[in-house]
């Protein structure tokens, strides 16, 4: 009898599926310090709440990829992931900075511009 119950439970689990829910990434772009033209700073792109963990994150200067460093991929209590990508930069009031995120939950890359006033 216990074997039958175990087989029924196993069958029910296979019907419901065990795959994790896919989650769309949340993107925040910000500088470490308030922006001052000509003063070195750090540009951060913090991407959180996404699943599955495979993701591509680029910081862009006038649409061109910048050389970046990144934190280790980490996960939250709800098993969603987060990652910080960052680089040093010197704002000048002319160049435009943004973060581009590509993830399986997105139909096209998500681009979030840095707002120097935030």
UniProtKB/Swiss-Prot annotation:
Keyword Signal in annotation: yes
Residues of the signal peptide:
1-20
The record lists its disulfide bonds as 45-99
Q: Where is the Ig-like C1-type domain?
A: 25-111
Print the keywords alphabetically. Disulfide bond, Immunity, Immunoglobulin domain, MHC I, Secreted, Signal
Looking up InterPro entries in the UniProt record yields: B2Microglobulin, Ig-like_dom, Ig-like_dom_sf, Ig-like_fold, Ig/MHC_CS, Ig_C1-set, MHC/Immunoglobulin
Any GO BP annotation: immune response
**Gene3D superfamilies registered for this protein in UniProt:** Immunoglobulins (2.60.40.10)
Q: Which GO terms describe its cellular component?
A: extracellular region; MHC class I protein complex
Q: Where in the cell is it found?
A: Secreted
Q: Main location per UniProt?
A: secreted
Could you say which protein family the record assigns here? Belongs to the beta-2-microglobulin family.
* Assembly and binders: Heterodimer of an alpha chain and a beta chain. Beta-2-microglobulin is the beta-chain of major histocompatibility complex class I molecules.
Its annotated function is as follows:
Component of the class I major histocompatibility complex (MHC). Involved in the presentation of peptide antigens to the immune system.
* Family matches, as PANTHER family: BETA-2-MICROGLOBULIN, MHC CLASS II-RELATED
Record protein name field: Beta-2-microglobulin
* Underlying gene: B2M
């Amino acid at each position: 009898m216990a074997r039958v119950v175990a087989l029924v439970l196993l069958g029910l689990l296979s019907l419901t599926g065990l795959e994790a829910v896919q989650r769309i990434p949340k993107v925040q772009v910000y500088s470490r310090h308030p922006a001052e033209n000509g003063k070195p700073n750090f540009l951060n792109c913090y991407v959180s709440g996404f699943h599955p963990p495979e993701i591509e994150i680029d910081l862009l200067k006038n649409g061109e990829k910048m050389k970046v460093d990144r934190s280790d991929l980490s996960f939250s209590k709800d098993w969603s992931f987060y990652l910080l990508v960052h680089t040093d930069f010197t704002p000048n009031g002319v160049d435009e900075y943004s973060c581009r995120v590509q993830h399986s939950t997105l139909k096209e890359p998500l681009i979030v511009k840095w707002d120097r006033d935030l």
